[in-house]
A protein has these predicted regions:
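Short solvent-exposed loop/turn micro-motifs enriched in small/polar/acidic residues
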Residues: 13, 204-206, 274-277, 311, ...
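Active-site lining segments that contact anionic ligands and/or coordinate catalytic metals
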Residues: 260-262, 278-280, 287-290, 313-317, ...
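Active-site bordering "gate/hinge" segments
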Residues: 1-262, 399-401, 409-411
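Short polybasic amphipathic segments
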Residues: 210-213, 281-284, 387-396
Length: 411
């Protein structure tokens, strides 16, 4: 697949028809940067062609975003105007589907005051609570895709002097992860979904009470709440329409018990958070909460993340991804969680998805917390798996059943 236009057309088709699954008469909201415009034009046109009534493009520019972060005061930078909240809520209440196209450099905000970035994250989390609820409970459809910016491509391919070639290489790598390089991408996705669904069914039938992770620098037991549900690729919104939240996706996931996580865990891939890289970090848990942490890179940013709110020091999501997966086998480090989380077992600090608990979407926040489902304004995945990781599922009677051996499925 050498033709640039053909690549973008096929990618747009996968995003619109499989990821977002745009319905006739539906509104579409696209979040993107100016770097992604070549793809955004294609996605916008196709969305209209399949029947979208309105395609709202929320465009930002990385250079301007960096300047705002550098020169605005913390108070100005972290302020979320009411009109922005009202605009998003109006779309949410009218069955909008969100398409997020990631392009920004993982280092975009390197050197910016961590407290300023943390204040924006906290204020945005509180301001967009309705949005978070609609997304976490699948009321609205949403999908996340990506498009390579020059800065991001240079980070992934540091030895490539020609920026255009680096971007082309990254685009080709991205397209492989979302199966656009296949003769029939739709069929390829159907087969992939079925494989992940079978893994989820096995785990649901076992009904483990906890998982025990062991590898170099990791010895962690994560409790699983009563009535938890393992979820594979693919969701349904409130109107019954299918959608695929992450493109790519290789994970099977559920909620962790917010009060039953003990031991220590170390990251195996860098974490890009708030335009900064956090790497070589270790978290120690007791009774579900991070009680100690260290990081060789990005310590202050990690501290801001953990201090976002009470729930940001607890586990919301538990996700299983084999080391023998397409993204992992590519040998590339994307410095982008959307990709790196799909190359590795991972956990998420912060909010759990109510969809991973029986009747969870019908519960209040208080009821979810009583059911040991974590609540937070944040949800940040970090990668912990490698080729040496073993995972045992623990049954109620204490019996241990192999789930992963040497980084891959044991069943």
């Amino acid at each position: 697949m050498n033709n640039f236009e053909e690549k973008l057309n096929k990618y747009a088709e996968v995003i619109v028809k499989i990821g977002a699954n745009v319905q006739k008469g539906q509104k579409v909201w696209i979040n993107c940067t100016t770097d992604a415009l070549p793809l955004v034009y294609k996605v916008t046109e196709l969305a209209y062609q399949v029947g979208a009534s309105d395609v709202h493009v929320k465009l930002t520019d990385d250079k301007l975003s960096r300047l705002h972060a550098e020169y605005q005061s913390k108070e100005v930078y972290s302020h979320i105007p009411q009109w922005a909240i009202d605009e998003r809520n109006d779309y949410l209440d009218n069955n909008v589907v969100f398409i997020h196209i990631l392009s920004s450099s993982p280092n975009l905000f390197a050197g910016i005051d961590a407290e300023k970035l943390g204040a924006l994250t906290k204020n945005a989390g509180e301001a967009y609570k309705h949005y978070r609820t609609c997304i976490m409970t699948d009321i609205n459809s949403w999908t996340i895709a990506s498009y390579p910016s020059a800065d991001w491509a240079k980070l992934v391919f540091p030895d490539e002097e020609n920026t255009d070639i680096a971007q082309e290489k990254l685009l080709d790598a991205i397209l492989k992860t979302v199966r656009v390089d296949k003769a029939d991408p739709v069929k390829a996705w159907e087969e992939h979904r079925q494989n992940l669904t079978e893994k989820a069914e096995f785990l649901n039938n076992k009904n483990f009470v906890a998982l025990h992770y062991t590898s170099k620098d990791t010895d962690l037991t994560v409790g699983l709440p009563k009535n938890h549900i393992w979820v594979a690729a693919g969701c349904k919104n409130a109107k019954g329409a299918d959608f695929l939240p992450n493109m790519p996706t290789e994970e099977v996931f559920t909620a962790g018990d917010r009060d039953r996580v003990d031991g220590y865990v170390s990251n195996k891939k860098p974490l890009s958070y708030q335009g900064n890289i956090i790497d070589n970090f270790k978290l120690t848990f007791k009774d579900g909460k991070v009680v100690d942490f260290e990081a060789e890179q990005g310590y202050e940013i990690l501290k801001q993340l953990l201090d976002t709110d009470e729930g940001s020091r607890r586990i919301g999501e538990v996700a299983l991804v084999p080391n023998d997966s397409p993204i992992s086998n590519s040998g590339l480090l994307y410095y982008q969680t959307l990709f790196d989380e799909n190359a590795s077992n991972h956990l998420a600090l912060g909010a759990a998805y109510p969809t991973t608990l029986k009747d969870g979407t019908k519960m209040t926040e208080e009821e979810l917390e009583k059911a040991h489902i974590n609540q937070s304004i944040s949800h940040v995945d970090f990668m912990i798996g490698d080729a040496e990781m073993d995972i045992d599922g623990i049954l109620e009677d204490g019996t241990k059943i192999p789930v992963f051996r040497k980084g891959n499925w044991a069943f």
